[in-house]
Amino acid sequence: MVQDMKDYNVEPENITLSMDTLDKKILELLSVDGRKSYRKISRDLGVSVGTIHNRVDKLTKSGIINKFVPVIDHEKLGYHLTAIIGLEIKGGTVAHLIEKEPFKNNLLAVYDVTGQFDGILIAKFKNTFELNKFIKQLLQEDNVTRTYTQTVLNIVKEELNSSMIDFEE
């Protein structure tokens, strides 16, 4: 999910949507297998297929479900290097980077943060040459004053979906 930060001086509306037990169970099942058919979900939960369809439609229209996407194994595509990149930014935000051609293909996550850095990027690369080129291009950005890069030695856990969130509150 990308938050529009065109005017970062305006506080975004903080809306918490409510879900009942059935909605939560549907989300749990879809978090494990996003391709699971409505028919199988309806059997698992003991409700009609129409009910599942209507609930998923409601969850999608309300923005709780943003999209259905595959979970990609980047290693199998040749992206063996994961980098965590801290950015010092001179005014503004890191949000503009996600649309720029040299950056958008490698970025998995972009965060505005507090602390030592103004932004954190998580990116994947095929090799150190690609990472080096990426960093050099970042430093050519007018508002990027410094980068601090850490390469990941071992991925212990990497799930960029919400399957581990406790829906049972």
Which residues does each predicted region cover?
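A compositional/biophysical signature of low hydrophobicity enriched in polar/charged and small residues
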Residues: 1-169
